[in-house]
């Protein structure tokens, strides 16, 4: 169950010494039983890769993601048949599992599809560059203001029925701009730039606001991290100037796979989160969707925004290390990884040990060959033979009443 975050009290209000991440204040947007923004914890999302027409497969994929911590699940809806399949998926989910907050991904000329799927999901994602698709011209090199405005009117008329439907149902919309699919008129007017991405989002926001609909989440994704960072920062600047407080969905699109895909996503998402920007995240990997969820939670844990696992502090090892640090860290982690909320330090020697682990709940430190010292906070509790270290650490945690069985 979601709970509102309580800001940590500042011990030093001087900005250069303030280690607290001060999140941008945003309006709360309900997506099923989950709230994005409004001071709630950063929400984790992903997307199934099953064909939505495969009812059983889609239900299984949604359930797999939700069971490992994916709080909102997105599905692709490229046709009317896919939209209608969402009714069956929802019914089947309720029968075999539970209701899960669902988002429908709607793209090319998607009004009829979006109106149908809005009955069956909690949020509809639209791409401003594709929602009213204009086939690129090979001869055009610019748009006059009149032409620009004429297409804007067409977009408004096409978007209005969906906005009214979502508004009247109390549901949400994500205005999801992608750098790679900006509309031609935006490209000619603003260039292939973060400014074009922001103006594309603002055009759709204004249409929604004109109909008194503000259950909006905004994203401005790009496959290049510097472009993504610039777009979100500019979006925040423009929203602040315009008095807007919409929550932001962060992600680096098409990040790839493996180690680099994870690093690339983290470089973009974590940078913005550290600046207080962002209310929900997705790490997009060219892997099974289940692989994305641990990366999301690791990013949030590393920044101190959500604590969903044990925090381990361990030195990188050097010539002073008095035991096999990598092996011992593995043993400690395997024995204690279920103790969510604890900070445990494993340090190879006395030089850095006590100081670096001062904020940890428990410490495991090499002090002399064949022996290790166990700490509770800054206090050394006992010195024990190395081969008894992990078990003695467990006993210390148990004695403090902080142990739970795996």
From Swiss-Prot:
<dbReference type="InterPro" id="IPR011005">
    <property type="entry name" value="Dihydropteroate_synth-like_sf"/>
</dbReference>
<feature type="binding site">
    <location>
        <position position="356"/>
    </location>
    <ligand>
        <name>[4Fe-4S] cluster</name>
    </ligand>
</feature>
<comment type="function">
    <text>Converts 2C-methyl-D-erythritol 2,4-cyclodiphosphate (ME-2,4cPP) into 1-hydroxy-2-methyl-2-(E)-butenyl 4-diphosphate.</text>
</comment>
<protein>
    <recommendedName>
        <fullName>4-hydroxy-3-methylbut-2-en-1-yl diphosphate synthase (ferredoxin)</fullName>
        <ecNumber>1.17.7.1</ecNumber>
    </recommendedName>
</protein>
<dbReference type="GO" id="GO:0046429">
    <property type="term" value="F:4-hydroxy-3-methylbut-2-en-1-yl diphosphate synthase activity (ferredoxin)"/>
</dbReference>
<keyword id="KW-0560">Oxidoreductase</keyword>
<keyword id="KW-0411">Iron-sulfur</keyword>
<keyword id="KW-0479">Metal-binding</keyword>
<keyword id="KW-0004">4Fe-4S</keyword>
<dbReference type="InterPro" id="IPR045854">
    <property type="entry name" value="NO2/SO3_Rdtase_4Fe4S_sf"/>
</dbReference>
<dbReference type="InterPro" id="IPR004588">
    <property type="entry name" value="IspG_bac-typ"/>
</dbReference>
<comment type="similarity">
    <text>Belongs to the IspG family.</text>
</comment>
<dbReference type="Pfam" id="PF04551">
    <property type="entry name" value="GcpE"/>
</dbReference>
<dbReference type="GO" id="GO:0051539">
    <property type="term" value="F:4 iron, 4 sulfur cluster binding"/>
</dbReference>
<feature type="binding site">
    <location>
        <position position="315"/>
    </location>
    <ligand>
        <name>[4Fe-4S] cluster</name>
    </ligand>
</feature>
<keyword id="KW-0414">Isoprene biosynthesis</keyword>
<comment type="pathway">
    <text>Isoprenoid biosynthesis; isopentenyl diphosphate biosynthesis via DXP pathway; isopentenyl diphosphate from 1-deoxy-D-xylulose 5-phosphate: step 5/6.</text>
</comment>
<feature type="binding site">
    <location>
        <position position="349"/>
    </location>
    <ligand>
        <name>[4Fe-4S] cluster</name>
    </ligand>
</feature>
<dbReference type="GO" id="GO:0019288">
    <property type="term" value="P:isopentenyl diphosphate biosynthetic process, methylerythritol 4-phosphate pathway"/>
</dbReference>
<keyword id="KW-0408">Iron</keyword>
<feature type="binding site">
    <location>
        <position position="318"/>
    </location>
    <ligand>
        <name>[4Fe-4S] cluster</name>
    </ligand>
</feature>
<dbReference type="GO" id="GO:0005506">
    <property type="term" value="F:iron ion binding"/>
</dbReference>
<dbReference type="GO" id="GO:0016114">
    <property type="term" value="P:terpenoid biosynthetic process"/>
</dbReference>
<dbReference type="InterPro" id="IPR016425">
    <property type="entry name" value="IspG_bac"/>
</dbReference>
């Amino acid at each position: 169950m979601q709970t509102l975050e309580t800001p940590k009290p500042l011990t030093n209000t001087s900005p250069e010494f303030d280690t607290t991440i001060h999140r941008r204040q945003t309006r709360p947007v309900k997506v099923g039983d989950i709230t994005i923004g409004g001071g709630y914890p950063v929400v984790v999302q992903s997307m199934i890769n099953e064909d939505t027409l495969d009812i059983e497969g889609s239900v299984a994929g949604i359930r797999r993601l939700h069971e490992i911590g994916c709080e909102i699940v997105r599905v692709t809806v490229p046709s009317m048949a896919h939209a209608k399949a969402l009714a069956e998926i929802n019914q089947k989910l309720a029968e075999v599992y539970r209701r899960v907050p669902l988002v429908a991904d709607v793209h090319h000329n998607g009004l009829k599809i979006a109106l149908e799927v809005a009955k069956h999901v909690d949020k509809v994602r639209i791409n401003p560059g594709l929602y009213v698709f204009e086939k690129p011209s090979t001869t055009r090199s610019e748009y006059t203001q009149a032409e620009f405005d004429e297409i804007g009117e067409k977009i408004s008329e096409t978007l209005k029925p969906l906005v009214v439907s979502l508004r009247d149902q109390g549901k949400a919309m994500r205005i999801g701009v992608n750098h790679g699919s900006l509309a031609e008129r935006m490209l000619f007017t603003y260039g292939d730039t973060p400014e074009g991405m922001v103006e594309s989002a603002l055009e759709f926001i204004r249409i929604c606001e004109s109909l008194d609909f503000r259950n909006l989440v905004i994203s401005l994704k790009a496959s290049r991290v510097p472009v993504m960072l610039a777009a979100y920062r500019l979006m925040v600047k423009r929203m602040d100037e315009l008095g807007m407080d919409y929550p932001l969905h962060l992600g680096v699109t098409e990040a790839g796979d493996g180690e680099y895909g994870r690093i690339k996503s983290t470089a973009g998402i974590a940078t913005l989160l550290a600046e207080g920007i962002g209310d929900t995240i997705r790490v997009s990997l060219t892997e099974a969707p289940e692989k994305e969820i641990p990366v999301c939670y690791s990013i949030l844990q590393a920044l101190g925004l959500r604590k969903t696992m044990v925090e381990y502090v361990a030195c990188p090892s050097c010539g002073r290390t008095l035991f096999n640090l990598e092996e011992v860290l593995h043993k400690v982690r395997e024995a204690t990884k279920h103790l969510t909320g604890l900070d445990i330090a494993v340090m190879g020697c006395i030089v850095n040990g006590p100081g670096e682990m001062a904020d940890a709940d428990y410490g495991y430190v090499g002090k002399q060959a064949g022996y290790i010292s166990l700490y509770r906070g800054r206090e050394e509790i006992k010195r024990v033979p190395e081969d008894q270290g992990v078990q003695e650490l467990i006993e210390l945690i148990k004695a403090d009443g902080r142990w739970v069985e795996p």
